[in-house]
Structure formats: C-alpha cells, structure tokens
C-alpha cells in the first residue's frame, strides 16, 4: 500500500506514525504449509532482518515475551526508531504481528512483536484471561524495554495495534506519552463490541444475560469446576455459520494462519475464559482519546470490513493530527496477512 502524503510527512518526525502506512504481514515457522491464496502470507520470513526472542517485566512483575526484529543493515552506533506491535485479540505474535514486524523492519525500523499477558509465551494465569488494563500495560512495558536499549531512540517509539490490540494501544497511549505515534489496523473496540455487538445489534437484555452467565460460572469454577471458554473462532463450519465467523475461520482454522503456541491446545486458541470476558464491558478505550493529541494517530481499515465502525468512531473522537485510511476492497481479516491488498 502506498503511504498517504500525510504519513510521508510524518515519517520525517517519528518512527511509529508510519508503522501502518506500509501495511505488511508477518511470518513464523509452522508445522503446516502456508496457504498463499489471495496473497495471504502470514508465515513470511524475511532475509533482511534478524529476530531475537526477548523477555521483560511489566509493572505487575509478569513476563512479557516478544520477538525483537532488527534490520541486518542497522547501524547500532546511531539511535534507531522503534515500533511495538500488538496481535489480534485471542491470537499470538505469530499471527499477523510478525509479518508487520518484519516488513517494517525491512524499512529500517526496529520492531518488537509482543505476546499479550495470559496469551502465547507471555506469563499470566489462568491462561486466556481478559484483563484490559494489563493488556494496555504490556505496551508501556515494551517501551520500558526498548527505551533502555543503547541503539534505540527513546523519543521515537511508536505503536501499532491490530484488531483488538488497536483498542489496547489507544488505552495505553492515553496515559503513556512515550508512545509518540499510534496506528491501528482493522481495529476492534473490544469494549463496545462486547457491550453492544456490531452496529449495536446486541440488546441490553442480552448483555445482562451474558453478565448473569459469567457470574454463575464464577461459583462453578470457585468450587473447582471446569473452566468455561467463550467467543473466539469456531472450529468447524456448517451451513448456518455466520459470514463473519467464516472470515475468521479462514485465517485461524486453516494453514493460512493457524498457530498453536506451546503449552496451549488447538481447542483453546482464540477463546478467552467466559468469566473474565465480561471485563470488556467496563472497557472504554475511546473515552478521552482526544487527549492523545498532538501525537499523531492513524486508523487503517478495509472499506469492506465488518469492523470499520470502530476505526470511524475513533477517528471522529480523536484530536489532530489524525488520518482515517480505507484500503479498497479489503475486509477485516484481509489486513491480517493478504499482501495483495495491503
């Protein structure tokens, strides 16, 4: 994708503002051959970068694990610009984040693709827990790490959030001015999506039923009962499978993007715990979004994306400078990895 003039100009001022201007896709090793139809390239492997596994603490003394991606031609005698990259909600860094991380590193940025707390290789028990404040903290912890590296310019660190991480990076940026520019791709406001559904399709009564189910399940689990999981991506398609679930299935349940991190199982991937998922109902990332200004914000969405309402709402509320960029012909999941569109 060709960068807009707005972000060509920003490139001279800050590293992360341009992070989504060249929407790229990432890769990693997988036991399955990657499905490359429609330009999908989730498991891309760059020959122009080095990848180093790093671990650092967040404020809660939890381990955050990430892949530090460094251009092979980087001059470590100078201070490089850096970008922190967050994966889609329920995913791990090996899904979409590492493609972006490598493509941006090929442009000269040092990038850091992290696993969220409770997911992937990062610590946190129980697994698959929803904790929006801790999710936001992961991005500030990543700045702690990057900003103390001798070859990184601590005043030129930005952040890119994909899908649900788009809302988490906004939450982080509101209280961490070290994030100098903020970009989102196919953003989901995980608070609004869980409270109201897409396009306000969920009623208050339905929301109350979800809350009641989670409350009842807490008793079950407190007494030693089995942990229950919710939402996420279906494991099989039927004639009645919703088109949006089919879109996610094509990425998460096929060789195109399927990845099971060590210590998890295919059955649990993408699924948060039911009792913790209601934490999203108290998550309002767009409140006070205008206070991020004058740091620049970029919202990228497909013009066919079922989720575009969230990027549009964030853009409407954000202060200047800001840009809303539509990728023609792209759906929500297309921007995870379909390089012919992004």
Regions found by a protein language model. Give the residues of each.
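Conserved alpha/beta-hydrolase
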Residues: 103-123
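N-terminal cap/lid segment of alpha/beta-hydrolase-fold proteins
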Residues: 35-78
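The serine-hydrolase catalytic nucleophile loop
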Residues: 90-102, 116
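Alpha/beta-hydrolase fold nucleophile elbow
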Residues: 151-163
């Amino acid at each position: 994708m060709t960068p807009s003039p707005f972000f060509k100009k920003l490139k001279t001022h800050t590293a992360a503002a341009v992070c989504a201007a060249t929407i790229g896709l990432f890769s990693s090793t997988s036991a399955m051959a990657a499905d490359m139809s429609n330009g999908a390239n989730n498991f891309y492997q760059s020959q122009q970068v080095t990848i180093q596994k790093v671990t650092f603490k967040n404020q809660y003394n939890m381990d955050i694990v990430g892949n530090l991606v460094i251009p092979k031609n980087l001059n470590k005698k100078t201070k490089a610009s850096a970008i922190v990259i967050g994966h889609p909600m329920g995913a791990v860094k090996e899904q979409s984040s590492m493609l972006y991380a490598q493509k941006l590193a090929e442009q000269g940025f040092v990038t850091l693709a992290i696993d969220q707390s409770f997911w992937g290789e990062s610590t946190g028990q129980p697994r698959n827990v929803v904790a929006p404040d801790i999710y936001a903290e992961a991005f500030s912890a990543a700045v702690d790490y990057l900003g103390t590296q001798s070859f990184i310019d601590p005043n030129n660190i930005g952040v890119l959030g994909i899908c649900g991480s788009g809302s988490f990076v906004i939450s982080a940026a509101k209280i961490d001015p070290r994030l100098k520019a903020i970009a989102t791709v196919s953003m989901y406001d995980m608070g609004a999506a869980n409270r109201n559904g897409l396009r306000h399709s969920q009623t208050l009564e339905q929301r109350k039923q979800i809350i009641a189910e989670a409350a009842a399940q807490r008793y079950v689990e407190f007494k030693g009962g089995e942990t229950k999981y919710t939402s996420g991506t279906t494991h099989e398609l039927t004639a009645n499978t919703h088109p949006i679930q089919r879109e996610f299935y094509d990425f998460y349940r096929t060789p195109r993007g399927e990845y099971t991190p060590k210590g998890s199982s295919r059955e649990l991937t993408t699924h948060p715990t039911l009792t913790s998922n209601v934490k999203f109902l108290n998550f309002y990332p767009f409140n006070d979004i205008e206070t991020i200004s004058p740091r620049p914000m970029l919202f990228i969405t497909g013009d066919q994306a079922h989720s575009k309402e969230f990027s549009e709402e964030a853009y409407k509320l954000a202060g200047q400078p800001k840009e809303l960029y539509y990728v023609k012909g792209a759906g929500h999941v297309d921007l995870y990895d379909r390089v012919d569109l992004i």
